[in-house]
Amino acid sequence: MVNKVVAENRKARFNYEIIDTYEAGIVLMGTEVKSLREGKANIAESYASDEGGEIWLINSYLPEYLQANRFNHEPRRRRKLLLSGREIHRLRSAINREGMTLIPLKIYFNDRGRAKMELALAKGKKLHDKRESEKERDWNRQKSRLLKAHG
């Protein structure tokens, strides 16, 4: 069960406090799947939003597939995310009531070859929270160096 990660949002865990994660399918066109397989997608500035009872991925970048001609896709188009009705209801209530956001963490191909997205329900970190997590990361790094040196 090897998942091939093709795009990752590395700053998400630094900028947001991750509350819960979900696996969502993505509605893609054929050229978008081929472009994803090349591994040049970018989801760093993207987010997901609830519109009309559906969850949509906004501002993600999948470059045009160069071998396709006139049937190519729009690189920054909105893409529908596939979740169960119960998950959509839970996400909608959390977004509307508690002021949380939906952040994509990574896009990958599962063992059946389907494009999936790991979506996080998150709350934005304040500046002092970011500093605190940076201090903690530095301390863990120093600790591992000391243990390795005196090991």
UniProtKB/Swiss-Prot annotation:
Basic and acidic residues: compositionally biased ranges: 129-141
GO annotation (BP), single: trans-translation
Keywords: Cytoplasm, RNA-binding
Gene3D superfamilies: 2.40.280.10
Pfam family, one: SmpB
Subcellular location, record wording: Cytoplasm
GO cellular component: cytosol
Comp. bias (Basic residues): 142-151
Domain of life: Bacteria
GO molecular function, one term: RNA binding
Region spans: Disordered: 124-151
InterPro entries reported for this sequence: SmpB (IPR023620), SsrA-bd_prot (IPR000037), SsrA-bd_prot_CS (IPR020081)
Family the UniProt entry places it in: Belongs to the SmpB family.
Chain's role: Required for rescue of stalled ribosomes mediated by trans-translation. Binds to transfer-messenger RNA (tmRNA), required for stable association of tmRNA with ribosomes. tmRNA and SmpB together mimic tRNA shape, replacing the anticodon stem-loop with SmpB. tmRNA is encoded by the ssrA gene; the 2 termini fold to resemble tRNA(Ala) and it encodes a 'tag peptide', a short internal open reading frame. During trans-translation Ala-aminoacylated tmRNA acts like a tRNA, entering the A-site of stalled ribosomes, displacing the stalled mRNA.
UniProt protein name: SsrA-binding protein
Gene label: smpB
